[in-house]
Amino acid sequence: DIPSLPEAADLAVVAVPASDVIASIAALGERGVRTAVIFSSGFGETGPDGKALEARLREVARASGIVLCGPNCLGFVNAFDNLYATFSQYAEGDVGAGPVAFVTQSGAFGTATAALIRQRGLGLGYFISTGNEADLSFSELMTAVVEDPRIKVAAGYLEGLHDGEALVRLALRCHALGKPLVLAKVGRRAAGQKAAASHTGALAVEDTVLDAVLRQYGVLRARNEENMLDMLEALSQPRVAEGNGLGIATMSGGAGVMMADRAEELGLT
């Protein structure tokens, strides 16, 4: 019973059937709530009817003065301030805050990656599952968290882009702040793009175009989960290597040759 709330909450967590979400958001707006996380699925990821419902949700939220995370998301965590707006298993085990911010378009993949980041002892300051991004986009959410001085490196999992220009602005802001941005972008081929669209309603983008944009603006692209974890571990250290100089020390001549070949491919000398 939203109207009977004793005062307006700072944040609403909405977990009701999709058919009831819009009415809930309207009622929250009337009560003075200004931010909401929507866990409910059944929107743009389901097809034309779901897209229409999501568009209506966006309209009502904006008319009500509410900013949204989601729908179809797993919420977010601000470990610095002990805020856990999620129903995922993220909060199990050691949840100490750290210098890494991780924003993901996949809730399940994101929570698994977050667990691996924490297993390496890196520490997550922020974890955000964006869902369908009916309102706040991946780039907007990431831009907000990189402004926190406690964050030293930002990482993200992308299935599609809703706003390429916003991603460029994010990259420029990270560069200005001196904070590396590491992205894992899936959907390189048609099958992956189709799967992403059915998952979170993600929009496909030509992979070669995205690669060129990321290189132009200094964004590091992770090939896979393990590659991302290695990058984050290196970049979150107190001292980060500068330049492209590389020394290789190995007991195996063959391994040294392989590493030398790979180093040259990556532009290391």
Describe the residue ranges of each PLM region.
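Catalytic-core regions of core metabolic enzymes
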Residues: 1-269
